[in-house]
Regions:
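Aromatic-enriched hydrophobic runs in primary sequence
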Residues: 7-11, 65, 74-78, 114-115, ...
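N-terminal export/targeting and maturation segments
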Residues: 2-83
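Generic alpha-helical propensity signal that fires on short helical segments
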Residues: 19, 83-88, 130-131, 136
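C-terminal partner/receptor-binding element of secreted or periplasmic proteins
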Residues: 125-169
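Mature extracytoplasmic domains of secretory-pathway proteins
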Residues: 57-126
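Generic serine detector
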Residues: 26-27, 40-41, 102, 108-110, ...
Length: 169
């Protein structure tokens, strides 16, 4: 091997080592919050010609959040607290969530729950939640005003209607 080839090989190896060190350093300096996104931004990124979309909560919020709950208008503050959800970032009027407000709550076993306020003009989940709660009540079951939870591996179906993503399943 010529002297030029040896020097070129040494430079390439040195550059490779520096790149690997930078990658290692950047991965160790990452923020501890592994939250990958939120429901609103995930649905907003869907192509305009897509009218139906299925998402998995774990794909939206990350594997660390194995369940998602929805807080809808009329839900009582004491019932939300019973579900061990910090109500600091949730708006209540007269002890209940007011009309026009809804929230998605990503639940983690090891991290603080992530609360996302949903804009009902962009993402509507409460119509479906209300229908499911009424169906449960007709069968003699009750949430007793609590927060409905969905496992992170259970798909959530959404359909776009007039620019609003509505949960349909």
């Amino acid at each position: 091997m010529t002297k030029l080839a040896r020097n070129l090989t040494a430079v390439i190896i040195a550059i490779f080592i520096v790149v690997m060190m930078v990658l290692l350093a950047s991965s160790t300096l990452r923020e501890e919050n592994h939250l990958e996104g939120n429901l609103s931004s995930t649905l907003a990124k869907a192509p305009n010609n897509l009218e139906v979309m299925t998402v998995m909560p774990t794909d939206v919020y990350g594997e660390e959040y194995p369940a998602i709950g929805f807080i809808c208008p009329g839900m009582r503050e004491d019932k939300v607290k019973e579900a061990q959800i910090d109500t600091e970032n949730i708006t209540f009027e007269d002890g209940a969530v007011p009309e026009g407000k809804s929230y998605a709550v990503a639940i983690s076993q090891s991290a603080k729950p992530f609360i996302e306020e949903l804009d009902p003009k962009k993402v509507e989940v409460c119509e479906m939640i209300d229908m499911q709660v009424k169906a449960m009540e007709q069968q003699g079951q009750s949430l007793d005003g609590g927060v409905p939870m969905i496992q992170g591996t259970q798909p959530l179906g959404f359909q776009r209607e007039d620019g609003t993503w509505k949960m349909v399943a």
